[in-house]
């Protein structure tokens, strides 16, 4: 029997200390990593529930284990809410991550050696879109497209590559691209060569749900996403589609289970259901609108301070700061900002002369600070402090002064009140 009042700090003080330190770090540091956010206490409550004890291989009503009648309800709630959120006719909420959701789609619709056309990691794509260090670039013949001199997706080049290589699948989506994507143009390109169009909307799913970013579902054969990032749920993945053919649904269902996964994580699926319910609330749309306003304010301020933003600004939640030609690298900038309690990630930029472990860029995003309650002026102030550090990354006095300002801002906007 397990006592309900058991204390981790008494049983495992080393682990309890690490968790407490992380809680403090999240409160005392400004989080600007574009893929990170804070989920609600309700999401965390469900994720830590007794549902973690239940094995439930299969799907609702068709399990390989008994005693699944309660978790069936949780999974069905997640499915129906995901469909409502994105205007989907099909949803699979079992993928453990966005990467596994992408992997499922590849394995469902492609054969090893087939050609895929995806966005280059160096130009803002994702590892799972055909990078040669990822399984997607090892099992498939991955052809990569990128951005033009203005930092925008070159649709004519994408079309030319598609006509030349005749891919079986075109992949649209990104991890570091700050403009809107023309999903219809991508579908037209895919149709020209008889390819599937897979859209990975992991970074913008929350914006899509709130109708502040174009919805890819009317154009894509299949759409994948994470459930954290802008969607502000637990770490996990989903696959959704609008009006899919029955054969496609069967392939997707059978590849997720039993194809690449066994038992689903029912505590995470239930937490997804809570997050989807939160995303259906009117306040979520207001939040996503503010995410974009804050990102625009930050990007504009950094440009006023002389820093180049790839593509000249942002239309979503993130921006990529291009520091090619400057003495400071992305790695050094990340470290200096970290000392000021501003958390960012180094990121390659188009035509980056530095290695991926050093880089000449920074990726910044506003989902987490907006969850805290930041408004445009807060992000303007924050952008100025970032520029102060980037202007003098080795100046301890500057870093200390910024750290004090960050501390005051964090006290003003606690994550969990």
UniProtKB/Swiss-Prot annotation:
* Chief location: cytoplasm
Which residues are (6S)-5,6,7,8-tetrahydrofolate-binding? 121, 125-127, 355-357
Q: What pathway does this protein act in?
A: One-carbon metabolism; tetrahydrofolate interconversion; Amino-acid biosynthesis; glycine biosynthesis; glycine from L-serine: step 1/1
Q: Could you tell me which Pfam families the record lists for this protein?
A: SHMT (PF00464)
Q: Which Enzyme Commission number(s) are on file for it?
A: 2.1.2.1
**Gene3D superfamilies for the chain:** Aspartate Aminotransferase, domain 1, Type I PLP-dependent aspartate aminotransferase-like (Major domain)
Give a yes or no for keyword Thylakoid in this entry: no
Among NCBIfam families, the record links this protein to:
PRK00011.1
- Assembly notes: Homodimer.
User: What's the name of the protein?
Assistant: Serine hydroxymethyltransferase
